[in-house]
Amino acid sequence: MRAIAVDIDGTITDKKRRLSLEAVKALRGAEEAGVPVIMVTGNILCFAMATSVLIGASGGVVAENGGVLHINDEVRVLGDISKAEMAYSHLKGIYPVRKVQFSDLRVSEIALTRDVPADTVREALRDFDVEVYDTGFAIHLTDPSVNKGSSLEILLESMGIEMEDVMAIGDSENDLEFIEAAGFRVAVANADPELREMADYVTSAAHGEGVAEAVRRFMGW
């Protein structure tokens, strides 16, 4: 294993978005052992960067569900937000949808509060060129040409690391692509059923404690 790619919300944080100290300790330990940690999130870049700095992660950041990358001090916007904007314009004419806090900081996608069920949103947008993800924290309207998996591959290529040499850890449906592509797939105990089914290892602990469990197990600590 040459790198660890890990989701943030619901994976290293709990339902209230509190960061797990156990996860931080384990991920810092991996970094100290020479295994770079990569943040892979649906959240905005500045949030992901702050989390990365707090942990001491050196592997770069995939943000906005693959729509934005931070590689070697360079920010790359890969997702086309105009697709989400068109879909949102249509949607708000039908349902009382609202954008999440700090939406003005998103540059590749739109994230909505979960006031309207995700399946209802998907049905309403079936003729639009967007992907709809429900993370349990927000409903994301994204450019379908990018996702966490495809953007992680770009980041890893810059690091000279193959996907098969990565342990990926996640919890929700927007993690499916990058978990599926990784060499070793980990689902925390609170993960969605589909993610648990594809995982090579499902932790006994939930959220950040599950991340710590997986890292320690496969680092041989």
Curated annotation (Swiss-Prot):
Keywords: Carbohydrate metabolism, Hydrolase, Magnesium, Metal-binding. Signal peptide: none annotated. Its EC number is 3.1.3.18. Coiled coil: none annotated. One of its GO terms (molecular function) is magnesium ion binding. It holds the Pfam family Hydrolase_3. Mg(2+) binds at residues 7, 9, 171, 175. It catalyses: 2-phosphoglycolate + H2O = glycolate + phosphate. SUPFAM superfamilies: HAD-like. It is an enzyme of class 3 (hydrolase). The keyword Transport does not apply. The active site is at 7 (nucleophile). Its cofactor is Mg(2+). It comes from the Archaea. Substrate binds at residue 148. One of its GO terms (cellular component) is cytosol. NCBIfam families: HAD-SF-IIB (TIGR01484), Pglycolate_arch (TIGR01487), PRK01158.1 (NF002245), SPP-subfamily (TIGR01482). Catalyzes the dephosphorylation of 2-phosphoglycolate. Belongs to the archaeal SPP-like hydrolase family. This is Phosphoglycolate phosphatase. It comes from Methanothermobacter thermautotrophicus (strain ATCC 29096 / DSM 1053 / JCM 10044 / NBRC 100330 / Delta H).
